[in-house]
Amino acid sequence: MNKTVLKRLLSYLKPDRVIVTIVLVVSLISVILDVQLPKILGDATTLISERYIASNYTSVDLEGVFAIAKTLAILYILAAGLNFLGKYFMSRVASDIIYRLQKEIDEKFTRLPVRYFDEQSRGDLLSRATNDIQTIDDSFSQVSNQIFTTVLTFFGIIIMMFTVNIPLAIIGFLGIPLSLFIIGLIGKKSSTAFANRQETTGRLNGYIEEYYAGHEIVKAFNYEDRSQAEFQALNDELYEHAWKAQFFSGLMFPISRLINNIVYVFVAIVGGLFAASGMITIGGIQAILQYMRNISQPMGDAANMIGLTQSMLAAAERIFELLDAEEMEEEGDKEELPAIVGDVQFKHVSFGYTPEVTLMEDLNIDVKAGETVAIVGPTGAGKTTVINLLMRFYDITSGAIEIDGHNIQDYKVDSLRSKVGMVLQDTWLFKGTIRENIRYSRPDATDEEVVQAAKQAFADDFIRKLPDGYDTYITEETDNISGGQKQLLTIARAILASPSIFILDEATSNVDTRTEMQIQKAMDHIMEHKTSFVIAHRLSTIRNADKILVMQKGNVIEQGTHEELLAKQGFYAGLYRAQFE
């Protein structure tokens, strides 16, 4: 059992320590009442039997029987009521812990760098935020409801057994260390199996998410059989870990019960001998045997809780790994980036996605305010990396990136990104109305401003033709608008932000030629007098750029206007001719 993870998980109880204290007190009173009952019942049995014998087996003290029954009923009701209260309050505490964990995960996602999401499986992240949280919720709710009463009942029964008859109590106690020893051995195997189960579940969820996202590609390349084989391999691995986890955790209770039953029989035999010799009353034997039966309940609960706790800790460890992941650099007292004109300079910039491999070295780019700069080059040349560095999705290794002479590293990243509008090749729409999706870039925008942005992006016409217009509900997977129309909405979203700098990363790659011409016309108007970076593979779309940067292996190897680069008959000219041959 991972004690560090357990200690950290228990630290989430601190805000509710008053309630936990109340639960502990309530549980203590409930257990005190509960463990008294077998002894009271045993004493009552002795009293009734002695009076019956004293009457020469002629009469039963019914009045005494009813009095005892009434007392027992009151005690049972009180114990049950207190037990209910304890479970109610502890369920609230468990829900509070899950709420705080979910809140921390949500806040953590906002502080994680883009690098983290690029390096992690999306399905595994979703599994940590959903499946692992649910595992903790299910396990903690059950464990927290049982933990106090189980521990207190266990020790309470042992104490009461010693008050009834010490020799029989010692005999009854002998099976407990053996049970705990065996449970401990099984628990180690169970813990490993639960940890493997959670890790494999994350990988399986990642595979399912990947398959679902790319199901068209899977079908297009007839990959179904191989995909099923890969899924089956992961599923078999999960099955192997899952059955082991359940098997080992399930062994604990029957083994504990078996040992308890053996000891129970032994206590009954010895108790009978003691009664025959007058060392214990009939009621005393009854009480001891009842306690032996009752102690199997907390022992069984303890075995069950060990399995649940191991499952919970395996899930908690994965969640804490996420919460402990390296965050974006603290911005401290950094200032807001002031209003900008749009001069952008890369000065001797070096960068690598990993420390071992340098992608860019001594990169220098000079863009004047209001210029439209196109970045072209083969796949892997570093085009998108330039944008990632400008947006500070990744931080440079050395050098400086300046806007209007301000080093962007010296200012709050939010203030930088608020001045830049991005339209990416991969469209992304959120669950909500079209109006809400466009307004995402500026939540305080009026309806009129939303419509104006849509008109500038040539999206207004198709939006108004939809049944609910701007109130049409869409999701990323929606099929009531085309891929090109989705791209138009993302462009409208960027326009609404009214940024000082525009970034268009293959913004027209998902639209038809007619729509591309509309977008290009809108872009020419919108980008007028604004610094714009355009990444494009279709070189025909960037002829009017003020400057074209040709990149290869992370460096700018050519730059100039479209006509100047064609006249050089260099790398760009070769790319351009290749597209039309």
PLM features per residue range, with description:
Residues 10, 18-43, 72, 87-91, ...:
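Alpha-helical segments in transporter systems
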Residues 114-115, 131-140, 144, 148, ...:
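An intracellular "coupling" helix at the cytosolic face of ABC transporter transmembrane type-1 domains
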Residues 15, 19-32, 75, 142-196, ...:
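Transmembrane helices of ABC transporter permease
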Residues 2, 20-82, 162-167, 278-282:
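Transmembrane helix-loop-helix hairpins at lipid-water interfaces of multipass membrane proteins
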Residues 51, 160-174, 244, 248-317, ...:
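Helix-loop-helix
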Residues 2-15, 125:
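A short amphipathic helical element positioned immediately N-terminal to and/or at the very start
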Residues 331-332, 337-581:
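ABC-type nucleotide-binding domain
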Residues 95, 103-127, 131-133, 206-230, ...:
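Short intracellular "coupling" helices and adjacent cytoplasmic loop segments at the cytosolic face
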